[in-house]
Swiss-Prot record:
Origin organism lineage: Bacteria, Bacillati, Bacillota, Clostridia, Eubacteriales
GO CC annotation: cytoplasm
Residues binding ATP: 14-22
InterPro entries: Cytidylate_kin, Cytidylate_kinase_dom, P-loop_NTPase
The UniProt record lists the keyword Membrane: no
GO biological-process terms attached to the record: pyrimidine nucleotide metabolic process
UniProt name for this protein: Cytidylate kinase
Record keywords: ATP-binding, Cytoplasm, Kinase, Nucleotide-binding, Transferase
EC assignment: 2.7.4.25
Entry GO MF terms: ATP binding; CMP kinase activity; dCMP kinase activity
Gene, per the UniProt record: cmk
Location(s) in or outside the cell: Cytoplasm
Family per similarity comment: Belongs to the cytidylate kinase family. Type 1 subfamily.
């Protein structure tokens, strides 16, 4: 908890692999806030679509799927999120390469996205939250108290993703991962009002070559200012 002052609503946006989820989780833990991983919510729906054989291009079926699906985030011991899909723990499975390949298109479906945004706004209403995603500061929480744009070079993001995948037991090729991230960047920057965008009021933090603890301390300094 904070020192008796109003608890903040903190928005973190940025491209895939920039480290925002890791940083957001730690910042939330340090502040005693709730961490909301919006990307995990979309990944859970993408996973269910894959299981049911629903193409990422079938917007109507995906929207219906969202209406019939329960995605729940629970606080994990490390301050992160435990992701439940219709009551099943899918925290690890949603990070698979197969899910990563379709989640950007799945998350672009308007009705699906709006349903999850309503849930996310409700979770943030009381304050004391750190939420990360692509359009948090611009659309989901436009009145957030602090807005951060977390970025890193494409090469750095690809290296991190490869390391993560290999640590989880997946095979990963650096060139293929870099191409996949570049493709996701292009998709994420062309989603209309939900596009990934660096806002004029956002505090930009480039994590290239920086340790996680350095980035966390930089963000906390901004959060503690009056």
């Amino acid at each position: 908890m904070t020192d008796g002052t109003r608890e903040l609503v903190i928005a973190m946006d940025g491209p895939a692999g920039a480290g925002k989820s890791t940083v957001a989780r730690i910042v939330a833990n340090r502040l005693g806030y709730l961490y909301i991983d919006t990307g995990a919510m979309y990944r859970a729906l993408a996973l269910k679509a894959l299981r049911l054989g629903i193409p990422e291009t079938d917007a109507a079926a995906l929207a219906d799927l969202a209406d019939a699906t329960e995605v729940e985030l629970q606080r994990a011991p490390d301050g992160g999120n435990r992701v439940l899909l219709d009551g099943e723990d899918v925290t690890a499975e949603i990070r698979s390469p197969a899910v990563s390949a379709v989640v950007s298109q799945v998350s672009a479906v308007p009705r699906l996205r709006q349903r999850l945004i309503e849930v996310q706004r409700s979770m943030a209403r009381a304050g004391g939250v750190v939420m990360d995603g692509r359009d948090i500061g611009s659309y989901v929480l436009p009145h957030a108290d602090r807005k951060f744009y977390i970025t890193a070079s494409l090469q750095e993001r690809a290296r991190r993703r490869v390391a993560q995948l290999r640590a989880e037991g997946h095979e990963a090729d650096l060139a293929a991962v870099e191409a996949e991230i570049a493709r996701r960047d292009e998709q994420d920057m062309n989603k209309g009002v939900h596009s990934l965008v660096q806002l004029p009021e956002s505090i930009v933090i480039d994590t290239t070559g920086k340790r996680v603890d350095e980035v966390v301390e930089e963000i906390l300094r901004h959060c503690r200012r009056t």
